[in-house]
């Protein structure tokens, strides 16, 4: 049972919802976050492969839902839609329906962090497989059972492994290399890199990499129906969560910590040490907002947007922050 409901230290078993180690496959599995809302988004887990000889994830595809694969340690040889490439720390691979994909660890203790939407991976697939394998030997492996099971869970089945075909990373549109965004916006104390756009999540959310300098802060001092999920990749962020009208919980989040904020929960974060944070569930139209802000700046290169006008833009594009700034710049 985790001590802090808003913080998951990904290396601490007590902070995980579930952990298991399979000696046969050499995979250490950790479940960090259950799916939320009717679209079942934000399920987040990790597969750690003990050695390069551990059983790889075979080539397969899904008929619905999305999977986002992110490496936090080690290296993988991946195939997506027939093209092979390497997935390294900081990289992101976003898989949509009918995209064949596979993963083979090539370094010991390689970690593959996976975020799901619309699939119900653990409770609908992993837990069912564990229970049937333990209590009803042979049932899960039965071909007739598999025909029904994989269809119900959006698994369109395993595919023949592609012919060897290693390509340059830029030729794989589903791959987002570390430090590179689909679109990029630099505002001095914070640089935003769009990693996954709304058109890739059926309009549900965007995923952003935030590169922030010490003193940058953002405040959501309101009660909005939003789930928020942040993964600290490096640096340190200080968080303040209002737990009642008179009480707050404060804590620091560092590398390989996730910050989990449920709906109707006022919170704030402030950067303590230069940080790289991945916003895994941005429901705002943040790309649209940045385009608007950039257009205004181009027309007014020597001016600073009025605060009331800026927050009006925020609300127009569903970015619900109540305060934002940088202590270095605010002086």
What is the predicted function of each stretch?
Residues 53, 64, 83, 99-100, ...:
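A generic "binding-loop/recognition-motif" signal
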Residues 72-73, 89, 233-234, 273:
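A cytosolic small-molecule/anion-sensing beta-strand core signal
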Residues 49, 102-165, 272-331:
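Double-stranded beta-helix
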